[in-house]
């Protein structure tokens, strides 16, 4: 289940299913708090927050083959994460939650969404436990090499035999789970590649 908050475009809170230990770690129950989390597990509910980020990054290769990766969050991304967590807290409280735990360093459990909002106010991005799923827009489709990495058929600009058919060819993050869209891109590129290769 998921919901769109009208005031939070690009933020998609939804339920998720994961092994109990993964839920505890995602909820900040690590180290000394893991035992506390295990005791709460029968009464614990969680939600996931997907954010269509606007930050930018790059990957370069060093001459020795190592990768140099840089990513910078846009200020609005951090604010939308905070607002999204408060929206999730409101939903969970409406469903009967008594205490609200978030995976943010230095933020203790809250009893009300308003209290959580105050605690999140001065938190920096480094305080949040984040991970990337379904990366998109890393090999954008575009009409030429200045506009994108691949053409509209998935062929890399400037390379004869490199085709890309995954979520990386989207122009940006879709803000939703991209499984169906990725399958459609794979089918599109695959059919064209089959034709080009004379299949």
Tell where the protein language model's regions lie, with residue ranges:
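FAD cofactor-binding and catalytic pocket of flavoenzymes
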Residues: 1-92, 124, 132-135, 157, ...
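Short beta-strand scaffold segments in enzyme catalytic cores
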Residues: 46-48, 139, 186
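Structural signal for hydrophobic packing residues in well-ordered secondary-structure cores
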Residues: 85, 89-96, 190-197
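A glycine-rich dinucleotide-binding beta-alpha-beta segment and adjacent secondary-structure elements
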Residues: 97-173, 179
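Active-site-proximal substrate-binding core of FAD-dependent oxidoreductases
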Residues: 102, 109-110, 191-199
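A conserved FAD-binding loop/helix module that cradles the flavin
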Residues: 172-193
